[in-house]
Amino acid sequence: MELENIVANTVLLKAREGGGGNRKGKSKKWRQMLQFPHISQCEELRLSLERDYHSLCERQPIGRLLFREFCATRPELTRCTAFLDGVSEYEVTPDEKRKACGRRLMQNFLSHTGPDLIPEVPRQLVSNCAQRLEQGPCKDLFQELTRLTHEYLSTAPFADYLDSIYFNRFLQWKWLERQPVTKNTFRQYRVLGKGGFGEVCACQVRATGKMYACKKLEKKRIKKRKGEAMALNEKQILEKVNSRFVVSLAYAYETKDALCLVLTLMNGGDLKFHIYHMGQAGFPEARAVFYAAEICCGLEDLHRERIVYRDLKPENILLDDHGHIRISDLGLAVHVPEGQTIKGRVGTVGYMAPEVVRNERYTFSPDWWALGCLLYEMIAGQSPFQQRKKKIKREEVERLVKEVAEEYTDRFSSQARSLCSQLLSKDPAERLGCRGGGAREVKEHPLFKKLNFKRLGAGMLEPPFKPDPQAIYCKDVLDIEQFSTVKGVDLEPTDQDFYQKFATGSVSIPWQNEMVETECFQELNVFGLDGSVPPDLDWKGQPTAPPKKGLLQRLFSRQDCCGNCSDSEEELPTRL
């Protein structure tokens, strides 16, 4: 192995481990980078922010935590949030323990003799729930009670929250979230691979130590290929989807030469690598079923947003540190308008559904076909319609897809064969997932009988394989072919409109999750003693001006550090 590759891998592994220090990869100036503004600087934000309970108190992670802190100051609200947490726990409880969990909820929160009776609950509804619980504890037993509890919290309690120091603190976090993002927000590490318009490399947020993958789209290459619409479409779809099973977009920014998408870093490699380069081709059935179930959940989340993926194949399914999968590369994904169909002969040969090959109209059926192809390949160790490393013309592959039934070996159990054959139905109207029930039809297949999808969706099931934390599951640095220089293309001022639409900075939910996961929220979210208002949250006070530097300090010290400055001597090199 070349010295350059050894050094690049060593530096990346050290960064993934948190740099070996107490700061876990954070810059030594991270508190300065994430310093709260005085609340008076958030006035415009306060006036413009939409007052939506679901968005501010449920969907946004920091908003949810701060609303819970507010509720903890009032006993009647504490009971409501404790009930909601109890319902969440009930929904992911294993089947055999769910009835006992439901009884505890009924006794604690819904009984007149219970210690934490929640307010404004119709007694008839409680009685119905108790009866249904004894008949059979279904996962959605408390759905209506949950809705009513949120409805109660969204009225007077929500209005009181908006006038509290907890909401003011939320405004400070939102102010930080909306600060400009530049290349200096990150440290850059080794190249991991290539995308359609440029390299993909590992990167790390200086302020938090969080690792990501940075997908660079070279501006000249985009312009030469007229790829502006495709690039913006991928960015906007990634921004819209919030799923445990689809890579998340955390930041979008621009440099002089490139547009950059900062995405979830998946250290475990892709399924193509694991199917074909980790011993005998293919997986044991249990492992293939686990991945198929997680992919099904990812497709369900995409389809819920009316997005058809259209490029499901092994190399686009990535593993994280723990062995869970995420769908990646949404360049061919497209939104399907409500009540309409779309048309487009796009995808990868061997994974395109018959209706796509025939250039017919469709909605979400191509994704369920591709899931069948992928499940088959994971079990058989080869694609259903083309053998690995065997050259076969595109026309012949497409003929097989349209006309010839796939063959099954004894590696397939009867249930695995049943699911594959139903997903690989040539007629989309008969295909599993396309009969009116969507993902629910697929989840209810007997092959998934032993899987608790609620627990799977919460990340509570142990994956069958965990990647080696000391391994780099990608090609050597020198084996990744470099892009040639784009010639004959000039960037013009009119291109800036497109760049501004693309480079929108931080994405709310992933950014807030980053603050929570890296413990920045926990360390910075401090209020005054005994509930007193800290100076930075006092509307009557004024921002404290930083002390003036002396002449010698201004001459010899570095510029004050904001979130976008380069870091000090503790930083690692940005390019190897």
UniProtKB/Swiss-Prot annotation:
Keywords: ATP-binding, Kinase, Lipoprotein, Membrane, Nucleotide-binding, Palmitate, Phosphoprotein, Serine/threonine-protein kinase, Transferase, Wnt signaling pathway. Its EC number is 2.7.11.16. It catalyses: [G-protein-coupled receptor] + ATP = [G-protein-coupled receptor]-phosphate + ADP + H(+). SUPFAM superfamilies: Protein kinase-like (PK-like), Regulator of G-protein signaling, RGS. It is a lipid-anchor. Specifically phosphorylates the activated forms of G protein-coupled receptors. Such receptor phosphorylation initiates beta-arrestin-mediated receptor desensitization, internalization, and signaling events leading to their desensitization. Seems to be involved in the desensitization of D2-like dopamine receptors in striatum and chemokine receptor CXCR4 which is critical for CXCL12-induced cell chemotaxis. Phosphorylates rhodopsin (RHO) (in vitro) and a non G-protein-coupled receptor, LRP6 during Wnt signaling (in vitro). Its main location: membrane. It comes from Mus musculus. A lipid is attached at C561, C562, C565 (S-palmitoyl cysteine). The modification Phosphothreonine is found at T485. The gene is Grk6. CDD domains: STKc_GRK6. This is G protein-coupled receptor kinase 6. Expressed in the brain in striatal neurons. PROSITE patterns: AGC_KINASE_CTER, PROTEIN_KINASE_ATP, PROTEIN_KINASE_DOM, PROTEIN_KINASE_ST, RGS. One of its GO terms (cellular component) is membrane. One of its GO terms (biological process) is Wnt signaling pathway.
